[in-house]
A protein has these predicted regions:
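Glycine-rich phosphate-binding loops that contact phosphosugars or nucleotide phosphates
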Residues: 1-109
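Internal, active-site/partner-interface "lid" segment
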Residues: 66, 80-81, 106-136
Length: 136
């Protein structure tokens, strides 16, 4: 798409990887409970750097929400496992939400199909954008 996005793990972030984050960036923190010590600390470090932070969580009142710029509280009735504890359905909700956000950001940035074609020449999508078929 032409949209710069990176994955930053909480543990590696505080051991040197914070250098990839600048003041112009937006960091989306994903935390089901919002109270994990390393996530709260990362949010505090990002705030000190002047980086815009958003929290996506399933917990209305949490420590991380007190430190970030914006919070989006999501709802989930059940994780889908027999004990309702494994991050199963919540990770799917995150994926759907983040994919939708990426599409909307691309739209607002004015990314065109030609831009997408240039930035995604490989695989089935690249072939389709060139009007080719891989398998018949």
């Amino acid at each position: 798409m032409g949209l710069d996005a990176r994955f930053l793990h909480t543990n590696t972030a505080v051991h040197g990887d914070l250098g990839i984050v600048g003041k112009q960036d937006l960091v989306l923190l994903l935390s089901k409970g919002g109270n994990t010590v390393e996530t709260v600390l990362l949010a505090q470090y990002l705030r000190e750097r002047g980086t815009l932070t958003w929290l996506l969580t399933f917990t209305e009142y949490c420590k991380c929400a007190e430190v970030v710029d914006e919070s989006l509280i999501l709802h989930l009735d059940n994780e889908g496992d027999e004990w309702d504890i494994m991050p199963n359905n919540s990770t799917s909700v995150y994926l759907i939400l983040l994919q939708g956000l990426a599409v909307e950001i691309g739209r607002r940035m004015g990314i065109t199909l030609d831009d997408f074609r240039i930035n995604h020449p490989g695989g089935g999508i690249g072939a389709k954008l060139r009007g080719e078929t891989i398998w018949k």
